[in-house]
Swiss-Prot record:
Protein name (database record): Lectin-like protein BA14k
GO molecular function: carbohydrate binding
GO cellular component terms, semicolon-separated: plasma membrane
Function comment: Has immunoglobulin-binding and hemagglutination properties, and can bind to mannose. Essential for virulence. May be involved in LPS biosynthesis or polysaccharide transport.
Signal sequence extent: 1-26
Gene source species: Brucella abortus (strain 2308)
Subcellular location per the Swiss-Prot or TrEMBL entry: Cell membrane
InterPro entries: BA14K
Note: Strongly immunoreactive, inducing both humoral and cellular immune responses in hosts during the course of infection.
UniProt membrane topology term: Single-pass membrane protein
Family, as annotated: Belongs to the BA14k family.
TM annotation in the entry: 80-100
Main location: membrane
Taxonomic lineage of the native organism: Bacteria, Pseudomonadati, Pseudomonadota, Alphaproteobacteria, Hyphomicrobiales
């Protein structure tokens, strides 16, 4: 078992050592760059095409476009403030319901006949008023309180 551990440790060391060499071989070599002519001036045109998309413009992205009535598809501003409150509220309600202790349902006191049969026979079953004797089939329980 000890030699197996040594073999595994040696194999892992060999694998890690071999894989660390590969990135150094794959690195690009530094090449001498040609000198840049300093007389060239970079210029950028400052015009926009006719159908230029300005991107996000505050107040116009799914917002009021000047129409008199509400139009479908537009985003109403400031209507998302209640989402986190609803999520935390739902979590609190569900968590409170889960953490409540289970209700304890007490068995009815029963009649003196049932109590007498339970105390007399370990295998007594009140649903059909029988008990299991050591030999034979189940038998009816007959107590001094029998009906």
């Amino acid at each position: 078992m000890n030699s197996f551990r040594k073999t595994c440790a040696g194999a892992l060391a060999l694998i890690f050592g071999a894989t660390s060499i590969v990135p150094t071989v794959a690195a690009p070599m530094n090449m001498d760059r040609p000198a840049i002519n300093q007389n060239v001036i970079q210029a950028r045109a400052h015009y926009r095409p006719q159908n230029y998309n300005r991107g996000h413009r505050p107040g116009y992205w799914h917002g009021h476009r000047g129409y008199r009535h509400y139009r479908h598809g537009y985003r109403r501003h400031n209507d998302g403030w209640w989402y986190p409150l609803a999520a935390f509220g739902a979590g609190a309600i569900i968590g409170g319901a889960i953490s409540q202790p289970r209700p304890v349902y007490r068995a009815p006191a029963g009649s003196p006949h049932v109590q007498w049969c339970y105390s007399r026979y370990k295998s007594y079953r009140a649903s059909d008023n029988t008990f299991q004797p050591y030999n034979g089939p189940r038998k009816q329980c007959r107590s001094p309180y029998s009906r």
